[in-house]
Regions:
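N-terminal DNA-binding recognition helix of tyrosine site-specific recombinases/integrases
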Residues: 1, 89, 93, 101-109, ...
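N-terminal DNA-binding module of tyrosine recombinases/phage integrases
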Residues: 7-12, 17-112, 128, 307-322, ...
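Flexible interdomain linker/hinge and immediately adjacent N-terminus
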Residues: 113-114, 163-197, 330-331
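Short, basic (Lys/Arg/His-rich) helix/loop patches that form interaction surfaces
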Residues: 124-127, 198, 202-205, 215, ...
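Long, amphipathic, Lys/Arg-enriched alpha-helical "connector/arm" segment
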Residues: 128-134, 179-205, 214-217, 225, ...
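Catalytic-site neighborhood detector that most strongly recognizes the C-terminal catalytic loop/helix
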Residues: 179-180, 187, 238, 245-249, ...
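Short, polar N-cap/turn motifs at the start of nucleic acid-interacting alpha helices
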Residues: 229-237, 375-398, 425
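C-terminal secondary-structure termini that scaffold catalytic or DNA-interacting sites
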Residues: 233-235, 245-289, 298, 410-466
Length: 466
């Protein structure tokens, strides 16, 4: 089945095999010593006999990834954002470093140094696969551990397909993912949120911030709302909001590659030759579709906003283009995410007295506030926030404000140091009696959760929601 031929100072192993299409082929591998050649001959014959022979293939990592992306995108119905981010990751963080390597030649000991290289790589070193000239300050801003972890996750999935395609026997990705150096997000407490809200004069921004603070809505979910999603008479007159869509700006190339059923509507371009489009799409996950309850002040603001939109249309009906969205510009066109972000940044620059947080930080602040108010009712708060799992919510809650911890310290101080220890006797060993059950309060559980690390919180979630 295989033979060895001496050629000069080397030894060649020759064998016959069939490629993936069943076509007969000849294999030829060269070794420095006869012992190596004999060992390879035995291995090849065994693999050909039991059907585990790996057909030689010259496919590179770059070729494999660009073959995998459309398959994965179609199979898992990627959103335009996920498609764009994945392509950018391949173009800028993988191909420039290991893209030309053959898939069959790559080993785990090649991937580890690759991760180390990325950890010392500046952000934006490559854009669309082209190396960029960076300033000295730009060179100091290195890729985050989160970005490197995302590269690992993508490669792990892609190489699992390579195994299924019989390109390789096992994935070269390391078993242990690169560690993520998590930093606590900056959030506001309830007093700061209310104080900040009271300083916002832009009506559209005020309403959007109000909804994010009270309902923990994502930016795209807020802008994706339509008047028909509001039911002011529901819940005995309290009013409800149905969240089932999201507004997003998406790359046109990505839109042409993904499942079109994910997109409900594509808005007309405002600029000729634009490379992106404003779209109305499905929400992030199934759990993101939810019914939320209005507070009385929010209900009043929503009614006032609807009245304002009517006035805008009546003031200039010939120039008004009703886009159908709840959040509109005075001309009726939709408020895009980048516009809302611009307004928020302008307001933030005018009010440096508030600790700097991004718009999405309002959602995290809201989730933390709701958990504190509910006494740690994770399921109820998860229903409000639309987090995919309670684990994600727990990780958000892990950085809760210092106030409860400070209050706990004050209680310990008041109790511990005020004890009367005069004449106190040494504690006697406990008798072998059944211990009296201790009443565990919600606050005790919350404090225990705050002290947990990420792994302990994930295990707790698995037990609670299995």
């Amino acid at each position: 089945m295989a033979s060895i031929m001496k050629r000069g100072n080397t030894y060649s192993v020759r064998y016959n095999y069939k490629d993936h299409a069943g076509k007969p082929c000849k294999g030829w591998e060269t070794f420095k010593t006869k012992a190596e050649a004999q060992e390879r001959k035995i291995t090849v014959e065994k693999e050909l006999l039991d059907g585990t022979f790996l057909v030689p293939d010259t496919m590179t990592v770059e070729e494999m990834l660009y073959k995998w992306i459309p398959i994965q995108s179609s199979k898992h119905k990627w959103s335009p954002k996920t498609y764009t981010q994945s392509v950018a990751m391949v173009q800028n963080l993988i191909v420039p470093y290991i893209g030309k390597r053959k898939v069959q030649d790559l080993r785990t000991y090649d991937i580890e140094p690759f991760y180390a290289t990325l950890s010392q790589t500046p952000c934006g070193q490559y854009v669309h696969g082209e190396k960029q000239e960076l300033t000295e300050n730009q060179k100091k801003r290195l890729l985050s551990s989160t970005s490197i972890h995302e590269v690992h996750t993508l490669l792990k999935t892609a190489f699992s397909y390579a195994v299924d395609w019989d390109l390789i026997h096992k994935s070269p990705t390391p078993r242990e993912a690169p560690k993520i150096n998590t930093e606590e997000r900056t959030i506001w407490d309830e007093r700061t949120m209310l104080a900040a809200l009271q300083t916002i004069e832009n009506p559209a921004l005020h309403l959007a911030v109000h909804m994010s603070m009270i309902l923990s809505l994502r930016e795209g979910e807020i802008l994706g709302l339509q008047p028909s999603d509001l039911d002011f008479g529901a819940a005995d007159g309290r009013g409800t909001i149905s969240v089932n869509k999201a507004l997003q700006r998406a790359d046109k190339v990505a839109l042409s590659k993904i499942d079109p059923t994910q997109i409900y509507h594509t808005f007309p371009d405002r600029r000729e030759g634009s490379k992106s489009s404003l779209i109305l799409k499905r929400t992030k996950t199934k759990k993101s579709n939810r019914i939320l309850y209005m507070t009385k002040p929010l209900k009043e603001e929503l009614l006032a906003w609807l009245e304002k939109m009517k006035q805008d249309e009546q003031n200039a009906p010939e120039k008004y283009s009703n886009c159908g969205q709840l959040f509109r510009l005075p001309d009726g066109l939709p408020i895009a995410p980048d516009v809302l972000t611009k307004w928020y940044r302008m307001w933030r620059a005018e009010h440096p007295e508030f600790e700097k947080i991004v718009f999405h930080g309002l959602r995290h602040s809201s989730a933390t506030y709701q958990l504190l108010q509910s006494g740690g009712d994770f399921k109820s708060v998860q229903g409000n926030t639309g987090h995919a799992t309670a684990t994600v919510l727990m990780d958000t809650y892990a950085h809760t404000q210092d106030k409860p911890r400070l209050e706990l310290t004050e209680k310990i101080e008041a109790d511990f140091y005020s004890q009367d220890v005069a004449g106190a006797k040494p504690q006697e060993p406990p008798e072998n009696k059944t211990p009296v059950a201790t009443k565990i309060t919600g606050k005790m559980i919350l404090e225990a959760i705050r002290q947990m690390d990420a792994e302990e919180r994930r295990e707790l979630t698995r037990v609670l929601f299995a």
